[in-house]
């Protein structure tokens, strides 16, 4: 039996990894597993670049790195990823470490700026009244996330109308009027799945709090946010190496797949070289939904319709030295720097955030970098104005640290499409995985989807059958997946390394 996974992002790697592991743990004739990636590297939006800043104060070359896409994770909620990291020998302290978890909010004209810390830091601390409202919002919204009453609410509707009802303790809710415009809406515009057309206000309340719950611990256990030492690409490289050396998975880069169902199974062709083909019995499409529409030549109309519901937007990510994108007061610089948009302004409101890379990599806790005189550098997603070429960082080969990354919009249509595609998994021996198909598409969610698809494939391959199920209620499905993500009962002693 031959299984081809098309798409080498975390979603595709998760399917291949878990399928190989499932056969090792449950037995049976293991299939041939290959992962086809159109690009030259695996990992999807996990992309790291390295730079030289010349000679440092100690006379040695000063080298740094920056993640242009995926750059951190919440160890508390990433139960499955944590277990995989343990198994492959990717350990806390050496390979990933706690980041500095700080956030600033500011307007472009510098009239408003504050950090999320109540304790004053040279006059930049948030107003305690606003901080109290933020804490109240996170506590109440974290509970309401599990209440079906808000399934069709937008974020703006929740912020505006929720105070009309008492809180869980029966007391009136008195949120500061600055809560939405100066904190919640700007912060959501710093989330990768937001729509630039409609902005944060029209996003589903469930979608926003889904992310807040998993990545930032809202309504649950406190988050332990980690950065990847030497970048997220190093984690992907460690995972890929383990899969090839220990699990026998073939990873094939530079194969821009096109697939068609035939009487014998699936024929997959390299679109850049039609002479390169391979046959498979089962196909897992772990690409973005809009790419799947193009590369699967024999899609059923109902499947194509579900895929077409997923909207994508492209973001530009730049590593640079241009401090004009930060708060005017350097004392307000934080790991995450969120620009406040003027309420009601007529403009696109794309995913936008600027990281102070030194803080994200927690230089203050690293003796190698916690020294006076070292350069400060940044990563900006969708900067509000062009960054001069002279300020864009470059690697040793002269390549600019610029990346263009697609993200699906986690809107009401996406929530419905996830339920629809779940009911069509396995039809025509075709399965779907990847960020768009499971929750907000965080790596932990991609991994959980990989576990689920691997189980379906195992049942199909071993002859136990895997009948497609009726479409679940979209919000009930989202809620059940959220309960599963970060469930502490899923933690167990890591298996012995093979």
Segments from the language model and where they lie:
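Mid-domain catalytic core of redox enzymes
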Residues: 22, 258-401
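Conserved Rossmann-like nucleotide-cofactor binding loop
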Residues: 11, 41, 290
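Conserved N-terminal glycine-rich FAD pyrophosphate-binding loop of Rossmann-like flavoproteins
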Residues: 40-74
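Conserved flavin/dinucleotide-binding core of flavoenzymes
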Residues: 349-498
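Helical element adjacent to the flavin cofactor pocket in flavoenzyme catalytic cores
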Residues: 209-274, 278
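Mobile amphipathic helical/loop "lid" adjacent to a hydrophobic cofactor/ligand pocket
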Residues: 74-204
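Beta1/beta-strand and adjacent pyrophosphate-binding region of the FAD-binding site
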Residues: 1-11
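Glycine-rich FAD pyrophosphate-binding loop
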Residues: 20-52
